[in-house]
Regions:
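N-terminal nucleotide-binding beta1-loop-alpha1 segment
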Residues: 1-8
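Residues on the solvent-exposed faces and adjacent turns
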Residues: 6, 119, 145
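Active-site glycine-rich loop that binds ribose-phosphate moieties when present
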Residues: 9, 70-77, 125-128, 165-170
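Non-catalytic interaction surface on structured domains
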Residues: 10, 16-20, 212-218
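Short N-terminal binding/cap micro-motifs at the start of the first secondary-structure element
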Residues: 10-13, 33, 202
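Short, well-ordered, mixed-charge alpha-helical segments that flank or form enzyme active sites
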Residues: 11, 96-100, 124-127
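Acidic/Gly/His-enriched mid-domain segments of enzyme catalytic cores or analogous surface patches
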Residues: 17-20, 25, 29-120
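Long, charged alpha-helical interface segments
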Residues: 126-218
Length: 218
């Protein structure tokens, strides 16, 4: 499922996501992007504080869910309300930095799901416990810890062997692929994996091959 937010979302990026996850959910102001593209969403939801005043006639029968609470992001609301096995978020990166950070937080909250954020330049997802990623050699690949996490990797220019990454200390940005097969193993659901946007399909396969993290229960 593709979740379309109100942030920067060029049509080619939306179309690339829809090619992988063709059901569209418009998240608040993302409905304007959908209308501009001529794509009809299956659902519109959010706190609805940034929707356009008028919607196209084709949108008149679409279910609308108003979620006024302000304790979570619209992206988080969307993942909770209309869950999917594969969730691609477009229009959530490249705008306000605080919105971006909140969406990275949402990746951690939904670590049990296959969630990827897609922009014109990057794909961002959460590293599962252990999985294999296949990318062309020399492809940029970054690991960013959201909290201390022990990482083991192979197939990168600078591999890790049960080493700690920590946002207060050592991070793993601007690494690159050095072998046909990259393995990434994480001790906890806490490390972002960032790759060029043209490798969306490979990142989806990377997430889908792992059992993922257990769902946290309240």
């Amino acid at each position: 499922m593709t979740y379309l937010g109100a942030g920067p979302a060029p049509n080619p990026v939306i179309q690339a996501a829809l090619a992988q996850a063709p059901i569209l959910v418009a998240v608040d102001g993302g409905v304007a992007h959908a209308a501009a593209l001529g794509a009809v969403p299956s659902h519109i939801l959010g706190d609805l504080d940034s929707q356009p005043d008028a919607l196209p006639p084709a949108f008149s029968d679409i279910p609308v869910t108003h979620i006024p609470e302000q304790e979570s992001t619209d992206f988080d609301k969307a993942l909770r309300t209309v869950p999917a096995d594969l969730a691609l978020g477009v229009g959530f990166l490249g705008g306000r930095v605080d919105h971006e950070l909140a969406c990275f937080h949402t990746l951690l909250r939904h670590a049990h799901r296959n969630v990827l954020l897609v922009s014109e330049t990057d794909v961002v997802t959460l590293a599962p416990p252990r999985a294999v990623l296949r990318l062309p050699q020399k492809t940029r690949l970054s690991l960013f810890p959201m909290q201390p996490v022990r990482m083991t990797t192979t197939g990168l220019r600078w591999p890790l062997t049960a080493e700690w990454l920590d946002p207060h200390d050592r991070i793993g940005t601007s690494n690159s692929v050095d072998a046909p097969r990259v393995t990434i193993e994480a001790s906890d659901p806490a490390c972002l994996v960032i790759a060029p946007a043209e490798h969306l399909a490979e990142l989806i396969e990377y997430r889908r091959q792992s059992e993922g993290w257990p769902e946290k229960r309240a």
